[in-house]
């Protein structure tokens, strides 16, 4: 159940990766890649202050405010062989414990090695086997062939294209991708 993971988020493992919540000690690994402009090419913006100075991500700007438990899942992608955080994958904007959005980023030096596909597959499997979420969805700029390919390889279905829509901070054409629990279960049964 989703409610089982409101405060403590799990660590997931794949053959090459660990997916775990980020901790302040990860700031050095994050600093090496998180502010690189090529990550945000299709987002229409540069890296934010928190992305340029990742240690700020771990400081609560209003510690006196009581926070609600966070239903979102935000994992750092850790390469086992180096123990470095090389990216992140998130399931966020969870609505009514039924559906959520998918996002991911990776160190540009490691693009093309299948790490995001491996991480996203693990995240999707966790969501559909341990929570009641029934749908995951994502958007990707039509020009971002690598991101669109990741979603396709993970079983997401192209549901349509928005023309001249706003995605993050830019107006562009972007694809909408979706994956239903029943489609994922059917895909798992045939592989």
Language-model regions, residue ranges each:
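GNAT-family acyltransferases
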Residues: 1-109, 130, 164-191
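Conserved acetyl-CoA-binding loop-helix of GNAT-fold acetyltransferases
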Residues: 104-106, 112-129, 145-153
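Conserved GNAT acetyl-CoA-binding A-motif
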Residues: 130-139
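Short, Lys/Arg-enriched C-terminal cap helix and immediately downstream tail that follows
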Residues: 135, 163-164
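Short histidine
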Residues: 140, 147, 159, 171-173
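Conserved acetyl-CoA-binding loop of GNAT-fold acetyltransferases
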Residues: 152-162
């Amino acid at each position: 159940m989703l409610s089982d993971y409101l405060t403590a988020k799990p660590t997931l493992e794949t053959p090459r990766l660990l997916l775990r919540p980020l901790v302040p000690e990860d700031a050095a690994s994050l600093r090496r890649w998180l502010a690189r402009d090529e990550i945000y090419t299709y987002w229409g913006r540069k890296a934010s202050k928190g992305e340029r100075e990742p240690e700020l991500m771990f400081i609560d700007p209003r510690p006196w405010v009581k926070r609600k438990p966070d239903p979102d899942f935000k994992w750092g992608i850790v390469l086992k062989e180096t123990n470095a955080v090389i990216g992140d994958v998130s399931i966020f904007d969870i609505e009514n414990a039924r559906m959520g959005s998918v996002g991911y980023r990776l160190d540009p030096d490691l693009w093309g090695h299948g790490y995001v596909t491996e991480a996203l597959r693990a995240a999707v499997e966790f969501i559909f086997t341990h929570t009641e979420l029934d749908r995951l969805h994502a958007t990707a700029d039509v020009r971002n062939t690598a991101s669109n390919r990741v979603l396709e390889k993970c079983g997401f279905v192209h549901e349509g294209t928005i023309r001249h829509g706003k995605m993050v901070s830019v107006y562009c054409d972007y694809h909408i991708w979706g994956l239903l629990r029943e489609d994922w279960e059917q895909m798992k049964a045939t592989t």
